[in-house]
Design a protein with these regions (language model features):
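Residues lining hydrophobic/aromatic ligand-binding pockets adjacent to catalytic sites
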Residues: 1-233
């Protein structure tokens, strides 16, 4: 925090110790007894982060890892658990939920986000549908009470983490055939929709989305500056 300058903004990820229903240990994956523990999140993460970062804290992302069908609760139960958790932690306009299980991109969960003002983090990730499809399933609504719209450009569709890492390494250039033009088109269109609606759009770009995050960001800015009539969302 001592090295942050005025205007610097940080997005933090909530710890998997609280957000993940299962954790990997020496014996493989096991149920996490602290899953959605509101008190643990507040004492061990939220309170220290707010105290340390003050106004530099722009948001907290609750990244829900992908769950296979056999490991997944019904969407209604998941929505109820999420609502219970978000109601028990300190009220804050900087929360965003990233859902990596397509089955949870559904009305019961979106209704919770709408009621509580928690943002939907739109993520371009291995097993998720397109950014435009995620946005459409939410009724093309922006939920975050603080007016922040968050997009994460992480991996190409259908490509696992380790494969995208290996293909992008050493992260010093754009890799031929890796960067999705559709991803750029849809991200730019959603950014424009957000700005036009009076929101602030934040995009987090990973090297694994195409080889080099700064160059991907440059491509996205160029696409954003094009004629809105060419938008795809």
């Amino acid at each position: 925090a001592d090295h942050l300058k005025e205007g610097d903004r940080l997005m933090l990820k909530a710890p998997q110790a609280v957000v993940a229903p299962r954790l990997h240990g020496r014996g493989g994956f096991a149920a996490n007894p602290d899953y959605l523990d509101a008190d643990l999140f507040t004492r061990r993460f939220y309170a220290p982060a707010v105290k340390l970062l003050h106004g530099h804290l722009a948001g907290i992302v609750f990244e829900q890892e992908y769950r296979r069908a056999a490991e997944r609760d019904p969407v209604e139960d998941e929505a109820a658990d999420l609502e219970r958790f978000f109601r028990r932690i300190p009220a804050d306009r900087r929360y965003h939920l990233e859902l990596r299980t397509e089955a949870y991109l559904a009305a019961p969960v979106f209704d919770v986000l709408a009621r509580l003002g928690v943002g939907q983090a739109l993520s371009h990730w291995t097993w998720l549908p397109s950014l435009a499809e995620q946005f459409a399933r939410a009724g093309e609504r922006f939920f975050n009470e603080g007016g922040e719209v968050l997009l994460r450009l992480l991996t190409p569709h259908g490509m696992r983490y380790e494969d995208s890492y290996a293909k992008a390494h050493p992260f010093d250039r754009l890799v031929d055939g890796m960067l999705s033009q559709r991803m750029l088109d849809e991200a730019a269109a959603i950014m424009r929709r957000a700005v036009d609606a009076g929101h602030h759009a934040t995009v987090i770009v990973n090297n694994r989305a195409g080889g080099n995050a700064p160059l991907i960001a440059k491509k996205l800015v160029e696409r954003f500056r094009q004629d809105p009539a060419t938008d795809t969302v």
